[in-house]
Regions:
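12-transmembrane solute porter fold
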Residues: 18-40, 53, 241, 266-473, ...
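Structural signature of transmembrane alpha-helices in multi-pass secondary transporters
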Residues: 31, 60-63, 67, 94, ...
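Glycine/proline-centered helix-kink
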Residues: 126, 147, 152-164, 223, ...
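Small-residue-mediated transmembrane helix hinge/kink sites in multi-pass secondary transporters
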Residues: 43, 75-76, 129-130, 164, ...
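Hydrophobic transmembrane-helix bundles of small-molecule transporters
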Residues: 168-286, 294, 312, 451, ...
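Transmembrane-helix bundle of Major Facilitator Superfamily
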Residues: 2-196, 436
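Transmembrane-helix signature of multi-pass solute transporters
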Residues: 93-103, 116, 120, 186-193, ...
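Intrinsic disorder in cytosolic terminal tails and internal cytosolic loops
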Residues: 1-16, 469-491
Length: 491
């Protein structure tokens, strides 16, 4: 007996969808906030918990690793068994793991709970994009992705500020604990609201359909082999770590062969490889990879420069990047409206704005004394933030708009896995450039300039891909696509 609808209908059109979206965005906010908020809490962990440099590195990189590993399998699980259930389970585990992190009595326990927290975040993320695909169409979908883009931009940029405020308010001994406890009220409220508001869509697959465990193993090991040397680039000093990159490429190649075989045999693959036959999806995923390789690294090197070279406190460093976060939220909301009419042109404009903003920060470095850098960089920060917002949500909309709803979770998982791997690769490359210049006793301003120029290089690669896709289509298709009717929960 299959659980799919025999007569698909259009998604519900009541205001409940927007409330359900608010639940998804709240969960997305705290899961993405945790990618950056802990960075400023590392000294507090060392002082209050006795965390070594290795433990601190795993607190940061372990979250990114398990986050990235969970995305595609979790997306497929949501496609098969229902996104509402997968979302709520992931959110519950994330919230409990956050509490466990804050209560950890040793560095080892903190690392273990942090790994669990990352995997739970990776389970939540693809359900959000999948639910948006199911609940909205056309211009409404673009608006919903615009709001998601605002959350992505704000949560990533505001993390250092939020962490600085918490450490400053609570103190360095226990401040790191509250960096995790801050998730609890939001997580609990989102879970309770989700029970009531998230729609119950019928599962898209037969309950007897298998999950493809070998595909999960090959993909997981391949992504792990790619990400591990990148996220541990500074801590794992031996060159042998780079041997994992070709191993990862081979494993992903085997995954590709296995998934094609599954498709030929009429079995349900973990990942529908036909997605990559869509030019919009493939180019959009590559744009996302390149963009996040450049975007994430900006906050990484700025935090290092402001706190280590310019003498800023964690709070002051967070305030410095606040204009970027605010402008990013505004840009994402604007981009969600513009993409329906102007398509990939919006992404081209956004990427150009990010590149100009970064070049403006470099100009400030050259022209303004270091003690005045914070306020002088506000204008290029705003330009870059607007560009970032205009990039992320429109690119997500264009990348996923032609993906069948029944594959939306896995497709969103692929897109976000690319973002996580891109972020790790960018930080590894830019971090190497920054630290190598400092190791040769170069000025910190020159190290930051070289790091930002490297970030600009990644952004320009994304810009080139966006320009290549300009001719693909001018607009987001407004024609409604077949979707399943939700069964509204009254719980």
């Amino acid at each position: 007996m299959t659980t799919t609808c025999s007569k698909p209908q259009q998604p519900a059109t009541d205001d409940r969808r927007w409330k359900a979206l608010g639940v998804c965005l709240a969960a997305g906010f705290i899961s993405l906030l945790d990618t950056s908020i802990v960075n400023v809490a590392l000294p507090s962990m060392e002082r209050g918990l006795g965390a070594t440099e290795a433990a601190q590195a795993w607190v940061v990189s372990g979250y990114a690793l398990t986050f990235g590993l969970a995305l595609v399998p979790a997306g497929r699980l949501g496609d098969m068994r229902g996104r509402r259930q997968a979302f709520l389970i992931g959110l519950a585990v994330f919230t409990v793991a956050s509490a466990a992190c804050g209560l950890a009595s040793s560095p080892d326990r903190l690392v273990v709970f942090r790994l669990i927290q990352g995997a739970a975040a990776g389970m939540v993320a693809p359900q959000t994009s999948g639910l948006i695909q199911q609940m909205f169409q056309g211009s409404e979908r673009a608006k919903a992705f615009g709001l998601l883009g605002s959350v992505i931009g704000v949560s990533t940029a505001v993390g250092p500020l939020a962490g600085g405020v918490i450490i400053d308010a609570v103190g360095t001994d226990d401040g790191w604990r509250w960096v995790f406890f801050v998730n609890l009220p939001i997580g609990v409220a989102a879970f309770v609201a989700g029970l009531r508001l998230l729609p119950r869509y019928p599962a898209t697959a037969d309950r007897r359909e298998r999950f493809d465990p070998l595909g999960v193993l090959l993909l997981g090991c391949g992504v792990l082999a790619l990400m591990l040397p990148l996220v541990q680039e500074q801590q794992w000093t031996g060159r042998e770590k780079w041997a994992l990159l070709p191993v990862g490429a081979v494993l992903l190649g085997l995954f590709w062969v296995w998934e094609r075989r599954q498709g030929r045999l009429g079995r349900a693959p973990l990942l529908d490889l036909n997605l990559f036959s869509m030019r919009s999806f493939t180019l959009g995923a590559l744009i996302s990879f390149s963009y996040f390789a450049g975007f994430t690294t900006v906050f990484f090197v700025l935090a290092l420069f402001l706190q280590n070279a310019a003498g800023y406190s964690a709070l002051a460093a967070g305030v410095t990047v606040l204009p970027f976060a605010v402008a990013s939220a505004v840009g994402a909301a604007l981009g969600g409206r513009l993409v329906v009419r102007h398509g990939r042109k919006v992404v081209v404009i956004g990427l150009s704005g990010v590149a100009l903003g970064l070049l403006g920060i470099i100009a400030v470095l050259r022209l303004v004394p270091i003690e005045h850098f914070g306020w002088a960089a506000a204008v290029p920060m705003i330009v870059g933030g607007l560009g970032s917002g205009i990039t992320v949500s429109p690119n997500t909309t264009l990348t996923l708009t032609r993906v069948p709803v029944k594959r939306a979770g896995a497709a969103g998982g692929v897109l976000q896995t690319g973002q996580r791997v891109g972020s790790a690769a960018g930080i590894a490359v830019v971090g190497s450039v920054y630290f190598a210049h400092l190791a040769h006793r170069g000025p910190a301003t020159e190290a930051l300039e070289l790091g930002l120029l490297t970030s600009v290089g990644f952004i320009l690669v994304a810009l080139g891909l966006a320009v290549a896709d300009l001719g693909e289509r001018a607009k987001v298709p407004e024609a409604p696509e077949v979707s399943q009717a939700p069964v509204i929960s009254e719980a």
